Amino acid sequence: MARGPKKHLKRLAAPNHWMLDKLSGKWAPRPSSGPHKLRECLPLILVLRNRLKYALTKKEVTLILMQRLVKVDGKVRTDPNYPAGFMDVISIEKTKENFRLLFDPKGRFTLQRITPEEAKFKLARVTRVETGNQGIPYVHTDDGRTIRYPDPAISIHDTIKIDIESGKITAFIPFEVNNLCMIVGGHNLGRVGAVTHREKHPGSFDIVHVTDTAGHQFATRLSNVFIIGKASQTFVSLPAGKGVRRSRVDERNAALKRRGEKIETVA
């Protein structure tokens, strides 16, 4: 009979967006408890060892973190298995680098390099709006924050801009048609586009229709939509491709063009 929480994670059971190869061992790092779920996070050890190549082993990652040089959302983190998630800002003082954790158009975590000015804030989606004891209003966000006395105009599914140093709300983006969004779950994970229509289904899942800059249309659940900008102006810098998912044929033609080979078309 199992007693207590699980402490291990096999490599084959790890999320695909971690991009771990199957032949480098049997085990994968199991994320610690934190603001993001196991299958929606990227442990710090994978950030420093697998993505940035600043270390070769977990022991080296621990030595780096114990120098208290790595911050996530402005707080020093020394746990190699700390779960960093979507929109988190990772700062490394020694190298003066700042990264924001985003999804690429293929649905994989990517480290987007950002400027020091952009590293001062993060975006979070409002998941609940409540009124507590003595009539104090507060909101819950998808990264585990509870913020009191928000703007009365903020409602569920809106996105708030949080100042990392103070933890206060500096602006918010309402969930409206024509606003820019990124898909954070489902088959369209990582795609970016403008909200064109919202289908309401009482008692079931609301469906949101989105159109990207290439004119491709797709639909997803309301819970998978994260607003990142007003109209065509985004609040955060996006990875290469601007969230447009290309087809297999387009990717093949782009690869042939880079190599200088002839592109053959099938009639």
UniProtKB/Swiss-Prot annotation:
UniProt entry keywords in alphabetical sequence:
Cytoplasm, Ribonucleoprotein, Ribosomal protein, RNA-binding, rRNA-binding
Q: Name one GO biological process term.
A: translation
Compartments, as annotated in UniProt: Cytoplasm
Residues spanning the membrane? none
Kindly state one GO CC term assigned in the UniProt record: cytosolic small ribosomal subunit
User: Which coarse location class applies to the principal site listed for this UniProt protein?
Assistant: cytoplasm
What's a Pfam family this protein contains?
40S_S4_C
InterPro entries reported in the protein's UniProt record: Rib_uL2_dom2 (IPR014722), Ribosomal_eS4 (IPR000876), Ribosomal_eS4_C (IPR032277), Ribosomal_eS4_central_region (IPR013845), Ribosomal_eS4_central_sf (IPR038237), Ribosomal_eS4_KOW (IPR041982), Ribosomal_eS4_N (IPR013843), Ribosomal_eS4_N_CS (IPR018199)
Asked if the Swiss-Prot or TrEMBL record annotates the protein with the keyword RNA-binding, the reply is: yes
Give the S4 RNA-binding domain ranges. Answer: 42-104
MF GO annotations: inositol hexakisphosphate binding; RNA binding; rRNA binding; structural constituent of ribosome
- Any keyword Metal-binding? no
Belongs to which family? Belongs to the eukaryotic ribosomal protein eS4 family.
Q: What is this protein called?
A: Small ribosomal subunit protein eS4
Q: Which organism is it from?
A: Dictyostelium discoideum (Social amoeba)
